[in-house]
Amino acid sequence: MAITAAMVKELRERTAAGMMDCKNALVEAEGDMELAIENMRKNGQAKAAKKAGNIAAEGAILIKTTDGLAALVEVNCQTDFVAKDDNFLGFANEVADAALASKVTIAELQAQFEEKRITLVTKIGENINIRRVEYVEGANLASYSHGATIGVVVAGEGDAESLKHIAMHVAASKPEFLTPDDVPADVVANEKRIQIEMAMNEGKPQEIAEKMVTGRMKKFTGEVSLTGQAFIMEPKKTVGVILTEKGITVSNFVRLEVGEGIEKKEEDFAAEVEAQIAAAKA
């Protein structure tokens, strides 16, 4: 498989490794991006292999709530200029309101608003996409929005302020699972295999490597789970400890971030302005 400059660029952005290291890793992996990252981790070259996708596309995360139900919707556009446009935000809010009212699937939501989307694309001159919708149910819901780029909803039992703080933590720390026990077996097995190979590459015998990995795996499952993470407001305590101390529980959470995993075509500011002027004249 031919290794393109775009592939090398993506791997550099995801790992912060050097250009030649990235190119060589892609050649070795025959163009398989995830395998290249895995191999680079083993070789100690990756600096950010945990990065959750390349944040590129623009748009907004909308959160709408009613009694016992919250809807989170991601609507994308091509530039941050349009992401702040009243027409775009009006459309995004209408989509989110419809999601909350009917609890429809993403396919149903896209179909429902396709005609309006096409009209907006024609008016604004950029591609608009209704990308994701997630729902959270619970008697007590806390939400947090970081601008319009990150949206979090937490379901649980406890006082509103504490649940809000947990939502803020989720926004900042990006947990993937609720507790260490919720980390899927295949994820744990894959990470354990990588850690053992890394330890053996350091010259450790397999028996010693496996013992070393036990501690590393506990750290890994803690870092990717909400209750195992250090609480951002009291870093010496885990979220799990904070929950116990405050007598609150969390049953579920959803975190959405604009453009997660979408590759964005890069344009300089002048080109972006020219594109907007051209669209306005069309």
From Swiss-Prot:
Any GO MF annotation of the entry: translation elongation factor activity
Region Involved in Mg(2+) ion dislocation from EF-Tu: start-end pairs: 79-82
Keywords linked to the UniProt accession: Cytoplasm, Elongation factor, Protein biosynthesis
GO cellular component, one term: cytoplasm
InterPro entries from the UniProt entry: EF-Ts_dimer_sf, Transl_elong_EFTs/EF1B, Transl_elong_EFTs/EF1B_dimer, Transl_elong_Ts_CS, UBA-like_sf
SUPFAM superfamilies registered for this protein in UniProt: Elongation factor Ts (EF-Ts), dimerisation domain, UBA-like
Task of the protein: Associates with the EF-Tu.GDP complex and induces the exchange of GDP to GTP. It remains bound to the aminoacyl-tRNA.EF-Tu.GTP complex up to the GTP hydrolysis stage on the ribosome.
Entry's family note: Belongs to the EF-Ts family.
HAMAP family per record: EF_Ts
NCBIfam families referenced in this protein's UniProt entry, alphabetically: tsf
Protein name: Elongation factor Ts
Species assigned in the record: Colwellia psychrerythraea (strain 34H / ATCC BAA-681)
Gene: tsf
